[in-house]
């Protein structure tokens, strides 16, 4: 992919935004090196990595990546035999801690069944060096200071050093407390000069304390003197400091030597953690943009649903559907320069670069984007001042280069194709360039304001027209892309809105040839019809989305129901077993007493009778109920066909197959609802054999046979109950096992009255409100005895 195209489409701005989501310089560096891949499998892998990262962010909110540092330079120094300072050692220890935390974090997710094939494998590459990590933790802190716990010798030296310093300060403080201190000292403070404790003495009293003068004030009136009484203590302090420094150097050298044995492992851990940081940055970036993982096409198919330009304000940007590669491979966006056409080009181009870089894209679920080997763009004024080329020449130079490198795995974006020269010649060139691009097998999206190109989408089977909608009422573009509708001139309408005389507009219209006027009218009609169709489509899509959510909720509830059912059965079984065990124990005791009585000759009870009684008691003990549903013997798999009766296992509902979507999915009619169901969730139901009909002889009034439902909506309360009474008799005579009584929702008075009546009817076995597909609580289902 050319860097020039990345610059034109502003991919560098996307990377800059992405760096804000990295937790380390390693993640930032990986982002700076990010470039679109052209190999389909590589793109699939990077998209899956990002999707797994997004899954982790959804489940856990964040990952334990904080504290990661670039330590490659430190490892290089160890490699050549150098020693590290305390801060460098701490940073390596921090990376080892992050490695351990990340591995544990990933293992926890994998243990609870979260599917993370790529990131799980990446986590497996991390090596936990717990002992090395702990050695560093007790040796240095986050500032790089070597801790007392690093060695016993260092702890002893520092303890002695602190006591010595306390003695020095105690002695000097006694001078400060002396009654003559205010007279002899410039200030009642202890300070340090040349790394030795001193007090500020007035010039005239320098001989009073003896000792060594280490410094004086600018005026010379104050001398900073180390009194003779603390010289030896300060000397001892300096000696201890030298020992401390020597011990610290020994400790750092020892730790550096131990780390040198793990250079390769630490290097690899750091690299893997950098990958994790990069992947989580992509995931968090996608979440912030409300982006999705797109389906990928290796056949040049693009179907973006509600795609948004990622660099524009999400609250204001207009989302557009963009599709290409199935019914047509070339889109020509025509119409005046009212804004929106170039944004469409950049949106498609930039989302392609993002997807091929493993980034999620700002669009709706189920969007598809193609993986291209090349993305070419001729957008904006690329005039070269050095070469003194005109705008037209600059564009043409770029187009010549594009046509020389394009192939059938290419996406070409032409902005204002043929502009900058005579309109007639420019339009002719544009048509020829589009034909040449198609001949190379490329996918093309081009914008132009030449009306001559409107016919291109009609005259070429591989092409279609498009335009950006313009609101004449507000005199501004809506930025809504209309694929299949060519752009039209709005000059007359705009002029009228701005107050131009109607006479002038009428005269202007008369000067336009009839064909152009008819074409504009046709385009206007197409726009209206398209807007209507799009509104209906959005409503249908919203309904489908709602149905899908209901299905998921229903499946979840059914799953919870069966889990609860199994739990209750198991509890009941255990309780029953406890009761029987108690009974057995009592029976054993009784049998023992009877046997004792028999031995004593007190009763004529036979031994086999005792054994038989015990056996029957043992058989009475229930076995724990297996909550696994018995499996029917395996039969040859049924090949599903349209019209088959099936059971949807996850819902426990029967349905009919409408049409096959793919090998993995069918459209199924369940009651009044049509749903997409996975093939693995379907079970074939054999057609029922016709049963012999019972002949029921009954005497009733001649008339229409009873229906399976009674509609009471609009009826008065008393009339409704009379109709229910009569209808139940007719339904029973007709042999219906159950019927539906429709009373509507309303205020609930009629529903309550009907329900109370049915509860007391001698032939009613049960009643319930209808399911959602049957009419909800506006319908009562009656089952007869």
Swiss-Prot record:
<protein>
    <recommendedName>
        <fullName>Endonuclease MutS2</fullName>
        <ecNumber>3.1.-.-</ecNumber>
        <ecNumber>3.6.4.-</ecNumber>
    </recommendedName>
</protein>
<dbReference type="Pfam" id="PF20297">
    <property type="entry name" value="MSSS"/>
</dbReference>
<dbReference type="GO" id="GO:0045910">
    <property type="term" value="P:negative regulation of DNA recombination"/>
</dbReference>
<dbReference type="InterPro" id="IPR046893">
    <property type="entry name" value="MSSS"/>
</dbReference>
<dbReference type="GO" id="GO:0072344">
    <property type="term" value="P:rescue of stalled ribosome"/>
</dbReference>
<dbReference type="InterPro" id="IPR036063">
    <property type="entry name" value="Smr_dom_sf"/>
</dbReference>
<dbReference type="InterPro" id="IPR007696">
    <property type="entry name" value="DNA_mismatch_repair_MutS_core"/>
</dbReference>
<dbReference type="InterPro" id="IPR005747">
    <property type="entry name" value="MutS2"/>
</dbReference>
<keyword id="KW-0378">Hydrolase</keyword>
<dbReference type="InterPro" id="IPR000432">
    <property type="entry name" value="DNA_mismatch_repair_MutS_C"/>
</dbReference>
<feature type="binding site">
    <location>
        <begin position="335"/>
        <end position="342"/>
    </location>
    <ligand>
        <name>ATP</name>
    </ligand>
</feature>
<dbReference type="InterPro" id="IPR036187">
    <property type="entry name" value="DNA_mismatch_repair_MutS_sf"/>
</dbReference>
<comment type="function">
    <text>Endonuclease that is involved in the suppression of homologous recombination and thus may have a key role in the control of bacterial genetic diversity.</text>
</comment>
<keyword id="KW-0067">ATP-binding</keyword>
<keyword id="KW-0255">Endonuclease</keyword>
<dbReference type="GO" id="GO:0030983">
    <property type="term" value="F:mismatched DNA binding"/>
</dbReference>
<comment type="similarity">
    <text>Belongs to the DNA mismatch repair MutS family. MutS2 subfamily.</text>
</comment>
<dbReference type="GO" id="GO:0043023">
    <property type="term" value="F:ribosomal large subunit binding"/>
</dbReference>
<dbReference type="Pfam" id="PF01713">
    <property type="entry name" value="Smr"/>
</dbReference>
<dbReference type="GO" id="GO:0016887">
    <property type="term" value="F:ATP hydrolysis activity"/>
</dbReference>
<dbReference type="InterPro" id="IPR002625">
    <property type="entry name" value="Smr_dom"/>
</dbReference>
<keyword id="KW-0540">Nuclease</keyword>
<comment type="function">
    <text>Acts as a ribosome collision sensor, splitting the ribosome into its 2 subunits. Detects stalled/collided 70S ribosomes which it binds and splits by an ATP-hydrolysis driven conformational change. Acts upstream of the ribosome quality control system (RQC), a ribosome-associated complex that mediates the extraction of incompletely synthesized nascent chains from stalled ribosomes and their subsequent degradation. Probably generates substrates for RQC.</text>
</comment>
<keyword id="KW-0699">rRNA-binding</keyword>
<comment type="subunit">
    <text>Homodimer. Binds to stalled ribosomes, contacting rRNA.</text>
</comment>
<dbReference type="GO" id="GO:0005524">
    <property type="term" value="F:ATP binding"/>
</dbReference>
<dbReference type="Pfam" id="PF00488">
    <property type="entry name" value="MutS_V"/>
</dbReference>
<dbReference type="GO" id="GO:0140664">
    <property type="term" value="F:ATP-dependent DNA damage sensor activity"/>
</dbReference>
<dbReference type="InterPro" id="IPR045076">
    <property type="entry name" value="MutS"/>
</dbReference>
<dbReference type="GO" id="GO:0019843">
    <property type="term" value="F:rRNA binding"/>
</dbReference>
<keyword id="KW-0694">RNA-binding</keyword>
<dbReference type="InterPro" id="IPR027417">
    <property type="entry name" value="P-loop_NTPase"/>
</dbReference>
<feature type="domain" description="Smr">
    <location>
        <begin position="710"/>
        <end position="785"/>
    </location>
</feature>
<keyword id="KW-0547">Nucleotide-binding</keyword>
<dbReference type="GO" id="GO:0006298">
    <property type="term" value="P:mismatch repair"/>
</dbReference>
<keyword id="KW-0238">DNA-binding</keyword>
<dbReference type="GO" id="GO:0004519">
    <property type="term" value="F:endonuclease activity"/>
</dbReference>
């Amino acid at each position: 992919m050319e860097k020039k195209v990345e610059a034109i489409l502003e991919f560098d701005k996307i990377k800059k935004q992405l760096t804000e989501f990295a937790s380390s310089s390693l993640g930032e560096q990986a982002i700076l090196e990010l470039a679109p891949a052209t190999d389909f499998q590589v793109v699939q892998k990077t998209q899956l990595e990002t999707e797994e990262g997004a899954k982790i962010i959804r489940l856990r909110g964040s990952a334990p990546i904080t504290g990661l540092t670039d330590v490659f330079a430190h490892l290089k120094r160890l490699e050549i035999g150098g020693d590290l300072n305390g801060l460098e050692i701490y940073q390596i220890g921090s990376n080892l801690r992050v490695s351990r935390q990340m591995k544990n974090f990933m293992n926890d997710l994998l243990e609870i069944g979260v599917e993370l094939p790529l990131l799980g494998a990446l986590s497996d590459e991390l090596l936990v060096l717990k002992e090395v990590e702990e050695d560093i933790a007790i040796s240095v802190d986050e500032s790089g200071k070597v801790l007392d716990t690093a060695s016993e010798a260092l702890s002893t030296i520092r303890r002695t050093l602190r006591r010595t310093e306390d003695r020095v300060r105690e002695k000097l403080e006694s001078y400060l407390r002396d009654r003559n201190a205010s007279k002899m000292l410039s200030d009642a403070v202890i300070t340090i000069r040349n790394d030795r404790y001193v007090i500020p003495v007035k010039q005239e009293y320098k001989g009073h304390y003896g000792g060594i003068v280490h410094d004086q004030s600018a005026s010379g009136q104050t001398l900073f003197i180390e009194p003779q009484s603390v010289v030896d203590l300060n000397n001892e302090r300096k000696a201890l400091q030298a020992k401390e420094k020597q011990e610290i150097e020994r400790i750092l050298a020892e730790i550096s030597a131990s780390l040198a044995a793990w250079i390769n492992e630490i290097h690899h851990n750091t690299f893997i953690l950098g990958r994790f940081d990069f992947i989580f940055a992509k995931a968090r970036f996608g979440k912030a943009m409300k982006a999705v993982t797109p389906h990928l096409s290796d056949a040049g198919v693009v179907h973006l649903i509600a795609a948004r330009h990622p660099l524009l304000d999400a609250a204001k940007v207009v989302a557009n559907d963009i599709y290409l590669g199935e019914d047509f491979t070339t889109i020509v966006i025509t119409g005046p320069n009212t804004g929106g056409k170039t944004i469409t080009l950049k949106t498609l181009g930039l989302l392609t670069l993002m997807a091929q870089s493993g980034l999620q894209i700002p669009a709706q679920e189920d969007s598809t984007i193609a993986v291209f080997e090349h993305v070419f763009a001729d957008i904006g004024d690329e005039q070269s001042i050095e070469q003194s080329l005109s705008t037209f020449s600059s564009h043409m130079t770029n187009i010549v280069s594009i046509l020389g490198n394009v192939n059938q795995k290419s996406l070409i974006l032409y902005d204002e194709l043929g502009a900058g020269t005579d309109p007639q010649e420019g339009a002719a060139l544009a048509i020829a360039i589009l034909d040449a691009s198609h001949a190379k097998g490329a996918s093309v999206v081009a914008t132009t304001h030449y009306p001559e190109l409107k016919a291109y989408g009609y005259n070429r089977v591989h092409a279609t027209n498009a335009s950006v909608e313009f609101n004449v009422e507000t005199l501004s573009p809506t930025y809504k892309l209309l694929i299949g509708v060519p752009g039209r001139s709005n000059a007359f309408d705009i002029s009228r809105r701005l107050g131009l005389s109607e006479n002038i507009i009428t005269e202007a219209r008369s000067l336009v040839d009839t064909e152009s006027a008819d074409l504009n009218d046709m385009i206007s009609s197409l726009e209206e019809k398209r807007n209507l169709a799009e509104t209906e489509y959005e409503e249908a899509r919203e309904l489908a989305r709602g149905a899908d959510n209901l299905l998921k909720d229903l499946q979840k509830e059914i799953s919870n129901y069966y889990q609860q059912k199994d739990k209750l059965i198991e509890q009941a079984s255990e309780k029953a077993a406890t009761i029987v065990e108690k009974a057995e124990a009592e029976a054993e005791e009784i049998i023992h007493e009877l046997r004792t009585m028999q031995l004593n000759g007190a009763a004529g009870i036979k031994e086999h009778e005792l054994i038989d009684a015990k056996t029957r008691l043992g058989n009475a003990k229930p076995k724990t109920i297996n909550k696994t549903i018995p499996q029917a013997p395996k039969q040859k798999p049924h090949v599903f066909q349209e019209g088959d009766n099936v059971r949807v296992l996850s819902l426990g509902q029967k349905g009919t197959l409408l049409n096959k979507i793919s090998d993995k999915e069918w459209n199924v009619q369940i009651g009044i609802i049509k749903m997409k169901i996975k093939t693995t969730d379907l079970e074939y139901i054999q057609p029922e054999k016709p049963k012999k009909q019972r002949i029921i002889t009954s005497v009733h009034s001649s008339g229409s046979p009873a229906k399976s439902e009674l509609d009471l909506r609009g009826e008065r309360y008393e009339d409704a109950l009379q109709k229910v009474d009569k209808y139940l008799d007719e339904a029973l005579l007709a042999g219906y096992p159950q019927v539906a009584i429709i009373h509507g929702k309303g205020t609930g008075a009629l529903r309550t009255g009907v329900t109370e009546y049915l509860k007391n009817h001698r032939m009613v076995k049960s009643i319930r409100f209808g399911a959602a597909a049957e009419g909800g609580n506006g319908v009562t289902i009656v089952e007869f005895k």
